[in-house]
């Protein structure tokens, strides 16, 4: 056992006298120089150790420190720890060097709590003595002083953090001006966010069942649809749970037969329907107009109704007109609008009608039928049935050749909303009908959707129905429908829908990039161009223009299908054409990558403009060019603009000839329908202005154009759509970077803005 040390007046806080401490220091010094000092050993051992130490000292080691010489504090403490750990660990416990306080503890009463050892701090008593303290030394406890780590930061780091805090405060003040930046407000906001980010079990969310609510209210022509978020759907789910699976029927408030309906309040008598039936033309004239409509319009990539059933109902109307009452107002409205549509195309059978001197060119054919149909619009809207969709679809198609764009947009909007109200855009809503009825509803919806988007695009309006909400498939072949003579070809109709969706995709791409909603890259353009050309490859040989004759029933519809293909190509390349025109006008330069991409897509666009003119020349030659067709006139109008801009960029005699051909077609239409003369004058005035400019004259006299514009006239080869090879276009690594200037130039996308005199044509219809 270690002998207890006697008290001494000169003992330090460690319990050693000054002489004993000096002796301990001498022993540690000897041990450091290689000596073997053992406390409590015999004198013999001590002498032997001294002799051995003397030998090492004689060998050239450091001289022995003189008594009283002061050792640096850090060295003294380190040596004391080594001695305690080696010789006195049984009494004090082992001392950890990493926890040692490297300075003497103050004896003043106001010493910091940080300098207290763990045991003294635990018992809340004063820590007295050096290290180890007196209490730990007396009780044989391990004396540990916890020293928290200190974060050392230089001035640069502090300055950087202050700048970051200043910037963050500026951002917060801009984004959240109502929030105060004082400490209590920030702490309250953190608590609020922490509470909102709490995690909850997901099982309750997966157990919630939401379903759409669909009910047939009257018959196959009128349905009532509401999605899962509606009040009726919620009531239906509650009723289902209460009834515990038993059958139940929730009737819509407007179909309750026990009370007077809202429709009865609006139209208490059927005098209007009866008077309009009485004012119909004779049966032979009625069917003549209907047959004209079905032959020249209904087969052109649209579907309106089942013509076989419609014709049977018209026969019944003339045989027994008294059987039709106010509830048949939708059918009578459809009949009047169909006759108005037939009036637009009646001159195709008798073209001399438009050349008659007694013909008033300012009269719109079928306007009286249209005015009579408008009398039934309030009743048709209130029914919200399938006939509502068909009636306003026909009304929009009838006015689409005119410049009443806002009215047409409203008509198609009503048709679209009626289709959504009837659930025609949902697969589950159509599943309860028979195969033919479900297919007819599907075809009608796609026709309305494509035309509504076409008019919306031309006016710069957003989508009325988001594409992701539509889950019905494309039309499917049914022999019972497609074998009929007056039902649109299944293949042509499906292809028209697909090219219409591609046109929407192209316009959405440019519109999103203009408003910074998409990071447009050359890869995106490549993808869409490939989709367009993949659609072109789907056309079978019997749908090629050179393989069909003008006597074919579907000739006009197939020509419109090809017009749709070239329209979407024009939409793809027109921004690059405007960009090149601005470059030439301002004498600016572009890098090689941008020039390559621009040249290719200008050729892509310009080639399609020439093809559109060729197709319209064919229609005019075979007397199928319609004066009152939206597609015929506005596709020619769009192609004329492309050729005109191309003429300003690369003037040539060939381009002038092509532009004159397009303007001749426009004049042919406006001479017989003067309401469109304003749109034609825009082209002719721009042509006259361009021909008078000095830049135009100087480029016209140039020997070489900026790039090749040699595109053959019709008839073209079967693979003419592949003549513009774009495969090598996308290999240039600099293309993506060079597009930035083009996409940041908002003026280059002026074609997206509404224009009274320029409506970009659709791709899916006959009107």
Swiss-Prot record:
Record bears the keyword Metal-binding: yes
Membrane found in the keyword field: yes
Single biological process term from Gene Ontology: DNA-templated transcription
Compositionally biased tracts (Low complexity): 35-49
SMART domains with a match to the protein in the record: Fungal_trans, GAL4
InterPro entries for the chain: AtrR-like, Transcription_factor_dom_fun, Zn2-C6_fun-type_DNA-bd_sf, Zn2Cys6_DnaBD
Sample GO molecular function, one term: sequence-specific DNA binding
Protein keywords: DNA-binding, Membrane, Metal-binding, Nucleus, Transcription, Transcription regulation, Transmembrane, Transmembrane helix, Zinc
Stretches with biased composition (Acidic residues): 22-32
GO CC annotations on file: nuclear membrane; nucleus
Protein name listed in UniProt: Uncharacterized transcriptional regulatory protein C417.09c
SUPFAM superfamilies noted in UniProt: Zn2/Cys6 DNA-binding domain
Residue spans binding DNA: 117-143
Bilayer-spanning residue ranges: 328-348, 601-621, 629-649
Predominant localisation class: nucleus
Bias (Basic and acidic residues) ranges: 1-13
Its membrane topology: Multi-pass membrane protein
Region of interest: Disordered: 1-75
């Amino acid at each position: 056992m270690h002998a207890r040390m006697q008290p001494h007046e000169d003992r330090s806080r460690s319990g050693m006298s000054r002489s004993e401490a000096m002796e301990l220091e001498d022993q540690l010094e000897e041990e450091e120089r290689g000596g073997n000092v053992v406390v409590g050993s015999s004198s013999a051992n001590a002498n032997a150790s001294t002799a051995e130490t003397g030998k090492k000292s004689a060998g050239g080691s450091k001289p022995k420190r003189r008594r009283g010489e002061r050792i640096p504090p850090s060295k003294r403490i380190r040596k004391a720890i080594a001695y305690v750990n080696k010789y006195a660990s049984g009494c004090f416990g082992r001392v950890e060097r990493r926890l040692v306080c490297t300075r003497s503890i103050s004896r003043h009463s106001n010493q910091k709590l940080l300098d207290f050892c763990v045991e003294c701090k635990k018992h809340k008593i004063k820590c007295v003595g050096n290290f180890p303290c007196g209490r730990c030394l007396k009780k044989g406890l391990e004396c540990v002083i916890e020293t928290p780590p200190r974060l050392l930061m230089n001035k640069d780091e502090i300055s950087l953090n202050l700048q970051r805090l200043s910037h963050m405060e500026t951002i917060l003040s801009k984004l959240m001006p109502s929030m105060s930046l004082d400490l209590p407000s920030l702490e309250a906001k953190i608590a609020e966010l922490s509470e909102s980010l709490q995690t909850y079990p997901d099982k309750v969310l997966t157990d919630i069942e939401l379903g759409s609510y669909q009910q047939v209210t009257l018959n196959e022509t009128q349905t009532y649809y509401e999605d899962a978020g509606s009040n009726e759907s919620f009531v239906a789910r509650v009723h289902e749970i209460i009834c515990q699976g038993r059958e139940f029927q929730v009737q819509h408030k407007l179909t309750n037969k026990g009370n007077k309906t809202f429709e009865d309040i609006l139209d208490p008598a059927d005098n209007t329907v009866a008077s309009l039936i009485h004012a119909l033309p004779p049966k032979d004239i009625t069917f003549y107009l209907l047959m004209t409509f079905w032959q020249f319009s209904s087969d052109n990539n649209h579907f309106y109704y089942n013509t076989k059933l419609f014709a049977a109902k018209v026969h019944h109307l003339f045989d027994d007109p008294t059987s039709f009452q106010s509830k048949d107002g939708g059918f009578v409205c459809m009949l009047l609008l169909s006759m108005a549509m037939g009036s637009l195309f009646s001159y195709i059978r008798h073209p001399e009608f438009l050349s008659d001197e007694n013909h008033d060119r300012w009269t719109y054919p079928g306007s009286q039928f249209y005015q009579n149909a408008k009398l039934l619009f309030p009743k048709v809207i209130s029914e919200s049935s399938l006939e509502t969709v068909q009636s306003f679809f026909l009304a929009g198609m009838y006015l689409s050749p005119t410049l009443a764009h806002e009215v047409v947009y409203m008509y198609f909007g009503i048709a679209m909303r009626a289709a959504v109200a009837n659930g025609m855009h949902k697969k589950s809503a159509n599943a309860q009908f028979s195969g033919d009825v479900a297919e007819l509803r599907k075809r009608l919806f796609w026709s309305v959707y494509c035309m509504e988007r076409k008019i919306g695009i031309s006016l710069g309006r957003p989508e009325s129905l988001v594409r992701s909400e539509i889950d019905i498939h494309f039309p499917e072949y049914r022999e019972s429908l497609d074998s009929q003579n007056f039902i649109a070809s299944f293949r042509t109709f499906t292809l028209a829908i697909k090219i219409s969706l591609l046109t929407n995709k192209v316009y959405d791409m440019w519109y999103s990039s203009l408003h910074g909603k998409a990071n447009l890259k050359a890869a995106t353009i490549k993808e869409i161009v490939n989709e367009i050309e993949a659609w072109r490859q789907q056309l079978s040989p019997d749908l090629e223009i050179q393989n069909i004759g003008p006597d074919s029933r579907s000739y006009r519809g197939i020509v419109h299908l090809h017009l749709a293909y070239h329209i979407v190509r024009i939409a793809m390349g027109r921004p690059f054409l405007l960009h090149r025109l601005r470059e030439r006008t301002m004498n600016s330069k572009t890098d090689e990558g941008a020039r390559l991409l621009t040249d290719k897509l200008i050729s892509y666009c310009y080639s399609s403009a020439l093809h559109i003119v060729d197709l319209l020349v064919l229609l005019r030659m075979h007397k199928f060019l319609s004066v009152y067709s939206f597609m015929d006139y506005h596709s020619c109008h769009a192609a004329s603009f492309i050729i005109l801009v191309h003429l300003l960029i690369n003037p040539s005699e060939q381009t002038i000839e092509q532009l004159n051909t397009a303007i001749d077609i426009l004049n042919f239409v406006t001479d017989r329908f003067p309401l469109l003369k304003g749109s034609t004058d825009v082209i002719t005035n721009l042509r006259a202005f361009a021909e008078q400019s000095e830049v135009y004259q100087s480029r016209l006299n140039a020997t070489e154009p900026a790039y090749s514009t040699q595109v053959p006239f019709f008839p073209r080869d079967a693979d003419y759509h592949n003549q513009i090879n774009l495969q090598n276009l996308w290999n240039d690594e600099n293309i993506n970077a060079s597009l930035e200037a083009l996409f940041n130039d908002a003026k280059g996308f002026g074609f997206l803005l509404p224009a009274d005199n320029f409506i970009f044509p659709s791709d899916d219809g006959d009107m």
